[in-house]
């Protein structure tokens, strides 16, 4: 909701006056609503659900990529939709193991992006996406990246600021302090 509102407002569209947005809690609800609405319907779906919907709904096209649209209107942040979180106490008590985990995590991301066919098999085997061919098609569009340190802090803090500006409760009522960002 906040991401869509931000992008719309930055493009001169008032989401409360210029259009009607109907939010759904499940991607399957969105796909069903698209099918019921017919031609001209518009939806926002994350990957891999957009790829799944395209396999079910003939003529369904991606006309806007939220990451690309975010980058057009925001120069001081990135659209961050997934992060790794750990308690400070845990990291302090297990620093070497945590650093090793981060290296493995980064390698895993690089492997997934370089080996989409093999990664898709794993994604399907673990039930993340129903079928490997669907996962293989969706993975390149998932924008799976590894960012850490000062770069991560800059990207994430800018994103959190956008959320905070719309609704402070979206980030727990206050912007996180510098100690929130590991290795920054």
Give the location of each predicted region.
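A general structural signal for well-ordered secondary-structure junctions
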Residues: 14, 40-41, 59-60, 118, ...
């Amino acid at each position: 909701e906040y991401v869509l509102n931000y992008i719309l407002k930055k493009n001169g569209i008032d989401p409360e006056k210029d259009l009607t947005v109907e939010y759904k809690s499940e991607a399957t609800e969105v796909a069903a609503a698209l099918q019921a609405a017919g031609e001209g319907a518009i939806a926002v779906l994350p990957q891999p659900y957009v790829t799944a919907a395209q396999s079910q709904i003939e003529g369904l096209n991606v006309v806007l990529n939220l990451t690309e649209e975010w980058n057009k209107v925001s120069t001081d942040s990135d659209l961050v939709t997934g992060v790794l979180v750990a308690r400070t106490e845990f990291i302090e008590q297990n620093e070497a193991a945590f650093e090793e985990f981060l290296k493995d995590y980064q390698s895993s991301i690089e492997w997934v992006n370089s080996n989409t066919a093999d990664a898709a098999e794993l994604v399907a085997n673990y039930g993340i996406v129903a079928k490997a061919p669907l996962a293989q098609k969706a993975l390149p569009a998932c924008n799976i990246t590894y960012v850490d340190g000062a770069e991560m802090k800059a990207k994430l803090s800018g994103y959190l600021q956008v959320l905070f500006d719309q609704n402070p409760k979206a980030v727990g009522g206050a912007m996180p302090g510098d100690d929130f960002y590991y290795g920054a």
